[in-house]
């Protein structure tokens, strides 16, 4: 069954494996995960748990700041006997009998060697051209060429007389939800609520990441 936890990306470092190989790892701090709600097939049509991560300040009247929880969020968290949470996610296809509302989920849910999928929001790159954004090839840089990094033709002259939807063009790059699949858990540090994941994961330092059992290899 699926297992899941929320955390923040701390950065990257290196560790040595048992055979002496140097392994690049991403350090993820995943503490303060609390089960806010259980969803069952009988009531909701599917099995899932709702997990909250990082405390948010209690409701403050007339405040429009995001650092304060609103009344519905505060009431929802109170049912679980915890403070309102900044990030809330659902993990489906999970054995709900193993969890209770208000229970803390720690990093030792996973073990070294587990295969996982990690979801995060990719780094924003700003407005970029076709070459960087879509990997298009550039034109010649010499011999009288007038075509270097321009996108080229984007549509027909008279027959269609328009640019079709979905055409790859310059624009805002990054800031998308990205999932990297089939990463390996290298090490668990339960005392410091830290998971070491082999390779890189999406997002900047201090970015929120969602770690769950691999959808392709985790249940085999």
UniProtKB/Swiss-Prot annotation:
InterPro entries in the record: Ribosomal_uL3, Ribosomal_uL3_bac/org-type, Ribosomal_uL3_CS, Transl_B-barrel_sf
SUPFAM superfamilies linked to this entry: Translation proteins (SSF50447)
UniProt keyword annotations, A-Z: Ribonucleoprotein, Ribosomal protein, RNA-binding, rRNA-binding
Pfam family of the protein (one): Ribosomal_L3
Lineage top rank: taxon: Bacteria
Single GO BP term: translation
PROSITE patterns: RIBOSOMAL_L3
Subunit organization: Part of the 50S ribosomal subunit. Forms a cluster with proteins L14 and L19.
Primary role: One of the primary rRNA binding proteins, it binds directly near the 3'-end of the 23S rRNA, where it nucleates assembly of the 50S subunit.
NCBIfam families, sorted: L3_bact
Protein name in the entry: Large ribosomal subunit protein uL3
Source organism (scientific name): Staphylococcus carnosus (strain TM300)
């Amino acid at each position: 069954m699926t297992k899941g936890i929320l955390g923040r990306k701390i950065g990257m470092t290196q560790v040595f494996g048992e055979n002496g190989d140097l392994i690049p790892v991403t350090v993820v701090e995943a503490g303060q995960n609390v089960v806010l709600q259980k969803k069952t097939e009988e009531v909701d049509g599917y099995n899932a748990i709702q997990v909250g991560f990082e405390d948010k300040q209690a409701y403050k009247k007339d405040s429009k700041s995001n650092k304060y929880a609103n009344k519905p969020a505060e009431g929802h968290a109170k049912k679980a006997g915890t403070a309102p949470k900044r990030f809330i996610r659902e993990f489906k296809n999970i054995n709900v009998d193993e969890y209770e509302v208000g229970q803390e989920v720690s990093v030792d849910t996973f073990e070294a060697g587990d295969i996982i999928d990690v979801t995060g929001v990719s780094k924003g790159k700003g407005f970029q051209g076709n070459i960087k954004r879509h990997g298009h090839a550039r034109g010649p840089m010499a011999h009288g060429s007038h075509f270097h990094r321009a996108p080229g033709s984007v549509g027909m002259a008279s027959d269609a007389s328009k640019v079709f939807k979905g055409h790859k063009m310059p624009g805002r790059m990054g800031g998308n939800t990205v999932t990297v699949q089939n990463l390996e858990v290298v090490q668990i540090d339960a005392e410091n609520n830290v998971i070491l994941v082999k390779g890189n994961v999406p997002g900047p330092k201090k970015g929120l990441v969602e770690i769950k059992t691999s959808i392709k290899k985790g249940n085999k």
